[in-house]
Regions:
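TPR-adjacent "capping" and linker segments in tetratricopeptide-repeat scaffold/adaptor proteins
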Residues: 2-17
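Helix-start (N-cap) detector for alpha-helical repeat units in TPR-like alpha-solenoids
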Residues: 15, 48-49, 82-83, 116-117, ...
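Structural signature of tandem alpha-helical TPR/SEL1-like repeats
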Residues: 28-36, 61-73, 95-107, 128-141, ...
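Structural marker of alpha-solenoid helical repeat scaffolds
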Residues: 43-44, 77, 111, 145, ...
């Protein structure tokens, strides 16, 4: 063994200090400092663990391009690590780069074709590429490998429902609810399917169950209000949006929907007030809302449901 030089000893010591300072800073949510520590550490020694910490910190700081470059560097350094490719797939998903997401998943599957997450992420890439048939096949493979894979059942149910396969989607939802009767996402999808297949009372039961489990579930209020509106029950629709706004006074979509109902009931002033509030809370939706607002007069003649 050749004795370490003074420089090597110093480098080793500095590397350890930087790495663990970075880990501490990351745990405390001090991301810019954590990133600086990890960057300096990998400049001394680009070992995989520290590169992985750096990639995670970049991701947390929403520096996705940097995270991707770091993960590519890890894949070049050690092309046998499945998790590197799965992390890369996750970053590509966040960037809506579904082609490269699919490639990363394929590389992960070559290394290990028994990893349910690889099939699940391949399905998400397929959905992004509007290839629902492949998505169903990949989700089915994920479920075969992991029988209680709730995310895969949920996603498969959503895709099946999008393809108007209500019966198959309902079977996946039943499986989800057998695994967890309080699964909010599954209950909402069950309610959506029941609403669309002329079972409004059972649908409302699903939405009410979700709201009793979680009074902050925004989607449940919207779906419940839409169903009341579809059945011309304006007062109940108003009540549900009143409740939503009482629980969350910053719920822009609820003001928007309540504004629609008020207009249908002939309360133009109340409607305008709610619309203004919706725009104030979510200015990014302003163009959409004002465009829709111009059509409201026509909508009152023919509610499009």
């Amino acid at each position: 063994n050749i004795p370490e030089t003074e420089k090597e000893k110093n480098d080793k010591k500095n590397f350890e200090i930087l790495k663990y300072d970075g880990i501490r800073a990351q745990r405390m949510g001090k991301l810019p400092y954590a990133i600086k520590c990890f960057e300096e550490a990998v400049a001394i020694n680009d070992e995989l663990e520290t590169l992985s910490l750096l990639a995670t910190a970049y991701t947390q700081a929403n520096r996705l391009d940097d995270a991707r470059i770091t993960l590519d560097r890890m894949a070049t350094k050690d092309p046998e690590q499945v998790n590197t490719f799965l992390s890369l797939a996750g970053i590509c998903y966040m960037q809506e780069d579904y082609e490269n997401m699919k490639d990363a998943c394929q590389k992960a599957l070559v290394l290990d074709n028994k990893n349910p997450l690889s099939f699940y992420l391949t399905a998400k890439a397929a959905i992004g590429m509007k290839d629902d048939i492949t998505a169903i096949a990949m989700l089915t493979k994920a479920i075969v490998l992991k029988e209680d894979y709730t995310e895969a059942y949920q996603l498969r149910a959503e895709v099946l429902w999008k393809m108007k396969q209500a019966k198959d989607a309902a079977e996946d939802i039943q499986k989800l609810l057998s695994l967890n009767p309080d699964d909010e996402q599954a209950l909402l999808l069950k309610g959506e399917i029941l609403a669309a297949t002329n079972e409004p009372e059972q649908a409302q039961e699903c939405f009410n169950q979700v709201l009793s489990l979680n009074p902050f579930n925004e989607k449940a209020y919207i779906l419940s209000g839409e169903l009341y509106l579809a059945n011309k029950d304006f007062d109940k629709a108003l009540a549900i949006y009143d409740e939503a706004i009482e629980i969350n006074p910053n719920f822009a979509k609820a003001y928007h929907e309540r504004g629609r109902i008020k207009l249908l009931k002939g309360d133009k002033d109340g409607s305008v007030e709610d619309m203004k509030k919706a725009i104030e809370l979510a200015p990014e939706n302003e163009i959409n809302i004002s465009g829709q607002y111009n059509n409201y007069e026509n909508m009152t003649k023919n509610v499009p449901f």
